[in-house]
Amino acid sequence: MFEYFYNEIFRKTIISFGTLFNDISIKHTDSDGNKSTSKVPLAYGPIGKFLARLEQSPNLNKSVAMTLPRMSFEFTGLTYDPTRKVTTTQQITVKDPDTETTTKKVFMPVPYNMQFELNIMCKLNDDALQIVEQILPFFQPSYNLTVNLVSEINEKRDIPVVLENVSFQDEYEGDFTSRRVLYYTLRFTAKTYLFGPVSSATTDIIKGVSVRYLAGGAKSTERDVTYSIK
């Protein structure tokens, strides 16, 4: 029952979620009207880790100070979703995408919801607003991610990523030497599926059919007819 298999579904979903936000930029305009564009860095990890680094190096003149704005995301939870459950005894049978001569099968997947947090950390409120406004219009309230959940059978599915809520906090406490940090937290749910092990289905394929029937009746000669297709 518990044979080894690893479809990397969690890993693929986490990576796909992160790619949604890895190309966000902000613009600044100086006093002369010149505009500059900078890409917002994105990293995986809890927000507490980044806030701790800010507290350890609050001096903006130090080369080790962490630059803002920046974003981080994290996989925070996992729950079973009974509303998307299907019959578990059914199977998906497909041709092996590598050989096209053999067939593989896998049982229907189990639905799970993955919870994510996206944290946006900024020094200026306008930077945060620029970032948030580039994200929210695409979630109404969901955005579909196409993920190849099982590469072995090329099983691609659209994974809805639902925006659950948005919260805002201003971490500006202490004296004038303290560094101000504004951050938004966006919480999402990705409705993914977990597949079990993939096995060979070549031996289960019907390669020939034979049909036999009797033709005729009481007033005619009966004929025993057999058709075979291979």
Residue ranges with predicted function:
Residues 83-86, 196-202:
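Short conserved micro-motifs at the rims of enzyme active sites and ligand-binding pockets
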Residues 1-91:
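Small/polar-rich, solvent-exposed N-terminal microdomains that initiate assembly or binding
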Residues 58-63, 100-108, 171-178:
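Catalytic micro-motifs at enzyme active sites that drive phosphoryl/nucleotidyl and oxygen chemistry
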